């Protein structure tokens, strides 16, 4: 809660949260094992529970799904905390971006993110779920989320990333003897990312109703960013509407962020908050998610060198 400002601001703020900070992995794993229909029911019933401030009995059917009563109680406690964060986000004009995390718990994360969206996205898009484009089912998954938001008449927001767990997910599939859920190549992931961004931009351009559609293109890939900007121009998506955001990690690819901001695009920096031991694994995964990160760093150093030389000449 300390990451949410106490006072509202005319400027929109952004905060990333991980549901594993609210619920333990075993609970999320069990919920992820449920059927698609059960997880959709979970979204509605969890929203009802959060809306009732924990007094609703809508989650009692989960007693037969959880291996222990303690797990169900942990779910309820986690939802009460999540409801508090959602309420604070609405009060302080803060967008909550829900991290996707590992595929073994991602279905439950999506269900609970949609539950929070049901209670927070009635007036604007406060809760944005994350789509990991390295997954083969990513295009299908984001379309299903979009349909859910449309059917329930709530505003829609998304965070689009390539994904930070490519190596461990592929290794887990190999050791487990099941087909890898991730795309076979980095090029396939790029195509997946650009396809999803193009689809979202098209939905934004076709959206004439009161229900807003927004997303953040979280990427260090110049080609994807350039393609998105060209597509925005083709679709006449105006900058001042803030329907499309751009984001990079704090301390990485600053020249891209600054160039976007200078051109009038809403651009933000993502910063990990916590101890060094907590933050380093997070940043390491983000480095792995883009195979061009080293080349990009070299390019950044070259640009920095040119800027230093330019300033020396000015003096």
Task: State the predicted function of each range.
Residues 1-315:
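Positively charged, amphipathic and often flexible ligand-engagement surfaces
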């Amino acid at each position: 809660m300390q990451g949410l400002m106490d006072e509202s601001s005319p400027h929109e703020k952004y905060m990333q949260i991980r549901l594993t900070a609210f619920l333990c992995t075993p609970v999320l794993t069990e919920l992820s094992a449920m059927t698609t229909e059960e997880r959709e029911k979970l979204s509605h019933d969890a929203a009802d529970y959060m809306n009732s401030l924990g007094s609703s009995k809508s989650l009692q059917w989960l007693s037969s799904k959880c291996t222990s009563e303690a797990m169900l109680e942990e779910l309820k406690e986690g939802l009460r905390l999540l409801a508090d964060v959602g309420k604070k986000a609405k009060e302080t004009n803060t967008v909550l971006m829900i991290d996707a995390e590992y595929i073994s718990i991602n279905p439950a994360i999506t269900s609970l993110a949609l539950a929070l969206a049901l209670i927070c996205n009635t007036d604007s898009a406060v809760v944005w779920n994350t789509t990991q484009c390295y997954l083969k089912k990513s295009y299908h998954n984001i379309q299903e989320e979009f349909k859910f938001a449309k059917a329930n008449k709530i505003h829609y927001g998304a965070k689009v990333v390539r994904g930070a767990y490519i190596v461990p997910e592929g290794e887990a599939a190999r050791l487990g003897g099941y087909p890898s859920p991730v795309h076979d190549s980095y090029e396939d992931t790029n195509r997946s990312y650009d396809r999803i961004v193009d689809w979202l931009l098209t939905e934004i351009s076709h959206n004439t109703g009161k229900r807003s559609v927004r997303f953040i293109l979280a990427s260090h890939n110049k080609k994807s960013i350039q393609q998105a900007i060209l597509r925005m121009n083709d679709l006449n998506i105006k900058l001042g509407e803030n329907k499309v955001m751009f984001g990079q990690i704090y301390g990485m690819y600053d020249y891209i962020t600054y160039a976007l901001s200078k051109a009038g695009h809403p651009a933000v920096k993502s910063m990990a908050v916590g101890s060094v031991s907590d933050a380093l694994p997070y940043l390491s995964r983000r480095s792995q998610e883009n195979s061009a990160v080293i080349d990009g760093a070299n390019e950044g150093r070259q640009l920095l060198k040119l800027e230093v030389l330019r300033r020396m000449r000015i003096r």
